[in-house]
Amino acid sequence: KDEHLFFRDGKYLNAKDEKGGKVFWSRGNGWVLGGLAEVLKYLPEEDKKYRPFYEQLLQEMSEKIASLQREDGYWRTNLLNADIYPMPETSGTGLFTYAIMYGINQGILPADKYLPIVRKGWDAMVKAVNTEGKVGWTQMVAQKPGKVVKKDTRAYSVGSLLMIASELYRYLDNNK
């Protein structure tokens, strides 16, 4: 709770990374933040029981996640100790960028603060698209932070790129 991040599961509550830090996995936290956006899509605006809780969680987590974005626009697989695996990673980056853009579009997150984060994330994701149209720098199926190589690709990174694109389109269409 203090970190405004989520452990992958109970096995990681006391786990430590190579530097003795807490283990907060990028893609796992991407599932949470992206999941919050998806939940909010289906909660009615007038819901006073659950909607405020999920909106606040999206706000708090987005603030923390934004602070962890690297200069190149990507997040690393180990969110709090990015230098352990310093290479870019697209599955977490895509989910974070999507959820933050959703939050902007819904008025949950302020555009002036978060659009620069989205721009950097979008640019990073686009740079990861190779000549075959695949999104590289994707951590393979895993359960914790780990090494990533440029050629690694999975459909879930393409999916998050398309989700970001749909939210960017919505934003641009509404702000002509």
What is the meaning of each model-derived region?
Residues 46-65, 110-126:
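Extended, well-ordered alpha-helical scaffold segments
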Residues 35-40, 62:
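Early exported N-terminus immediately downstream of N-terminal targeting peptides
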Residues 1-20, 64-84, 127-147:
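Glycine- and aromatic-rich loop/turn segments at beta-sheet edges
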Residues 19-27, 148-152:
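A short glycine-threonine-serine/GTX helix/turn-capping micro-motif
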